[in-house]
Amino acid sequence: MSAPAPVPDVDGVLARASFADDGLLPAVIQQHDTREVLMLGYMDREALRRTLTTGRVTFWSRSRREYWRKGDTSGHGQYVRDAALDCDGDTVLIQVDQVGVACHTGTRTCFDADHLHPVTGARPAADEGPTP
């Protein structure tokens, strides 16, 4: 028999999280096994609390001004596998098991459609490090 999952210290996480002036925290959603970035959403304190305690990702919709869970209408759910605040506490990474597509356009990820073709840089060789 496996041990029950530990109960998260939600109050501690909420105290460490640094929400913006509008009360929101960017949430990067990533497929847990492939590390594919699926989408970016926003969470307020309650959405983050729900995400950490229910096993389903909950967002705050800035346009509709309401909570929503990916998959409640489409069936394309996001099931929490792990979560971490960044070093400043002002962004959260939620690793999920994505069922179906993540994007409302019907694509796997919200970042598939428009590649920007930036100028890319090359990492300097070991002997070409910064000049002292």
From Swiss-Prot:
<dbReference type="GO" id="GO:0005737">
    <property type="term" value="C:cytoplasm"/>
</dbReference>
<dbReference type="InterPro" id="IPR002496">
    <property type="entry name" value="PRib_AMP_CycHydrolase_dom"/>
</dbReference>
<dbReference type="GO" id="GO:0004635">
    <property type="term" value="F:phosphoribosyl-AMP cyclohydrolase activity"/>
</dbReference>
<keyword id="KW-0479">Metal-binding</keyword>
<keyword id="KW-0963">Cytoplasm</keyword>
<feature type="binding site">
    <location>
        <position position="88"/>
    </location>
    <ligand>
        <name>Mg(2+)</name>
    </ligand>
</feature>
<comment type="subunit">
    <text>Homodimer.</text>
</comment>
<keyword id="KW-0378">Hydrolase</keyword>
<feature type="binding site">
    <location>
        <position position="86"/>
    </location>
    <ligand>
        <name>Mg(2+)</name>
    </ligand>
</feature>
<dbReference type="GO" id="GO:0000287">
    <property type="term" value="F:magnesium ion binding"/>
</dbReference>
<dbReference type="InterPro" id="IPR038019">
    <property type="entry name" value="PRib_AMP_CycHydrolase_sf"/>
</dbReference>
<feature type="binding site">
    <location>
        <position position="87"/>
    </location>
    <ligand>
        <name>Zn(2+)</name>
    </ligand>
</feature>
<protein>
    <recommendedName>
        <fullName>Phosphoribosyl-AMP cyclohydrolase</fullName>
        <ecNumber>3.5.4.19</ecNumber>
    </recommendedName>
</protein>
<dbReference type="InterPro" id="IPR026660">
    <property type="entry name" value="PRA-CH"/>
</dbReference>
<keyword id="KW-0368">Histidine biosynthesis</keyword>
<feature type="binding site">
    <location>
        <position position="103"/>
    </location>
    <ligand>
        <name>Zn(2+)</name>
    </ligand>
</feature>
<dbReference type="GO" id="GO:0000105">
    <property type="term" value="P:L-histidine biosynthetic process"/>
</dbReference>
<keyword id="KW-0028">Amino-acid biosynthesis</keyword>
<keyword id="KW-0862">Zinc</keyword>
<comment type="function">
    <text>Catalyzes the hydrolysis of the adenine ring of phosphoribosyl-AMP.</text>
</comment>
<dbReference type="Pfam" id="PF01502">
    <property type="entry name" value="PRA-CH"/>
</dbReference>
<comment type="pathway">
    <text>Amino-acid biosynthesis; L-histidine biosynthesis; L-histidine from 5-phospho-alpha-D-ribose 1-diphosphate: step 3/9.</text>
</comment>
<feature type="binding site">
    <location>
        <position position="110"/>
    </location>
    <ligand>
        <name>Zn(2+)</name>
    </ligand>
</feature>
<keyword id="KW-0460">Magnesium</keyword>
<comment type="similarity">
    <text>Belongs to the PRA-CH family.</text>
</comment>
<dbReference type="GO" id="GO:0008270">
    <property type="term" value="F:zinc ion binding"/>
</dbReference>
<feature type="binding site">
    <location>
        <position position="90"/>
    </location>
    <ligand>
        <name>Mg(2+)</name>
    </ligand>
</feature>
